[in-house]
Amino acid sequence: MLGGAKWLWGLVLALIDLWRALGPLWLRIPLLVGGVLILGYHVAQHYLRPNLTQETIYQVKYLNTGWSDEQRNTFYYTPQGTELLGLEYDWLVNLELPLSVERLASEENMRGWGFIVDPQQRPSPTNPGNLPVGFARHTDQQTGRQKVDLGCAMCHTGELHYQGTALRIDGGQSMQSIATAQRGEFITTLGASVFETLYVPTKWDRFAERLVGDDEETRAKLKKAFKAFSSKLKDFAQGAGAARLYPVVEGRGRTDAVGRIANVVFGFDLDEESNYRVADAPASYPFIWDIWRFDWVQYTGFTNQAMARNVGESLGVLAPIKLVNQQGELLGPEEFGETVVDIDGMHCVEGTLRDLKPPSWPEDILGKIDIAQALQGKELFAEQCHSCHGPHPSRSYAWPVATEPGQNPAKELAVNWQWDKAGQLSEVDGQTVRQDWRETIWSLPWVATDVIGTDPKLASNFMHNKYDASKLVPGSEPVNAGDGLQVLLNRLVPLLYRKWGVSEEQVANFDGLNVPFRIENKLAYTSRPLHGVWATPPFLHNGSVPTIYDLLSPLRARPTTFYVGNREYDPKKLGYKTSYAPGSFLHDTAIEGNRNSGHLFTDEEAPGRIGDLLTEAQRMALLEYIKVMGNPQFDQALQGDPLNWDNFPSPPQDPQLRAACERSHRWHFPQTTAQLSHGHGK
């Protein structure tokens, strides 16, 4: 120890001698300051370095059928009225990385953050900034400026990579992390870029020059608007977006959607800080190519109606809305609910999705199907999986509705009888109902959390986290997120219909297939059909199992830690590669909310047991069938597949779909409307 102290003292003396040898004090001080600045710059540059995956893509192949190119483009870039706190489209296109002159939203950077960019894509009328899938834009009705609009496709488009080929999965689950406020991720890098641009003159000059040129008056207006945006960004980061509220890292491909929606709506929008709740149950973005068939949607199956689901989602994705005044008091009827939520855009996207089919296994890229093995898997699926995953076709429902004040036949917490009766009504056994327009529906069974055994955190948070909604209903008791959204949306959606000119005759269609808005609260998860599930890793609702092979394996054989972010696909086990790579996140299943328990195939009586222990041969047979399950191209080879997706009824025709798409595009893209075409109603 004494020798170590002498060594340190000698080092101090050597540094003092070096300091004196640099020359007189007037020279040493500037040298010291310069050295500190250079060191600080390099430290900051390292700290702010983007956390990017490294991917090399030579070609893109689209695996879903049912869509024309125009329909795909409609899904990718139709706005729904969300915003990124007012970030203008041209601002995002022209911002630079922190401490760099490189464009922040370059193809390489955006792909590195997990967004989807086709190497061959070029600027187009609907995507003039050449941004990734889902980065749409809408026109602010007050200023005429175009804002970044985070569209449905951003979270619900997937991509699998295999040896340089990107396999596009329309309607699949994305692998971006736009909500994750971790060092080097998109949202934190954007924030650093905004504040550096605002306060570093040389960076501001480059930014302003690209946007408005040299005119000082226009530059002053730009700076005022940009500063206002930076203030919103800061306020949100200290409120609904505060990292402390999201202690379980979401990472690539996940977000606690319901928890974030609740924090935004009941905390940020209602200006009620006491409503912020810890949201620590991240879930994978669900795949959506068949949701129009479902009776109930979301992982816990808590709602049923397309329009209410989409409006609620848009509010959670920061669609600006006026609910309260500057004093936090509820606004009067003249101002309440002012928002840019795009009802036409939502109806356009929802209707377009009905034509989308699941992805087809590409034998030319991922390997030929072993038909004999797939036939064995078909029998195993019927024995072990069908009872939960179905599909379970059912006669469409006749939903009882209220037709006058005081009625509540569905026993909901809140009901808007005028909206209920605005649909297409009929009588069944003396009860006024809305008859669902679908020929058949898929009935999704709820499986209680203590039966399925998967991580219960998401369902538990949904049931037990309570929010004060008394500003909306004075004197009311605290409610969970589902009931609170019902209270708000029962009032808001009819207002939006009036604003967008939706006639009384059109309400049933815009609601979605004449379905009234309902909420169901259960400590359970729904069990959905699995067409195309091979293309949607990782698995279970929280993404805690990397491959389907692992999911079919005993719990002790499932990985307890693995990395997420690498989109390179494993066609043997049906999942992503899980080794560490730049840009990846560690998924630790020991953390509550991340657990990989349940959904077990075992001969032991254990919580979460759903089937018998599978041999290696049985697992591989199931995997082979899952690759082609329901695919009509393999129906004959499989000696008739009862899950052939072409055997299920087609969606009802939507006579208002084309007009809704055209109205949305005409408003937001007036200069390009003549160049847009749509492939609906095929």
Where are these regions (language model features)?
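Periplasmic c-type cytochrome electron-transfer domains
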Residues: 15, 22-31, 37-682
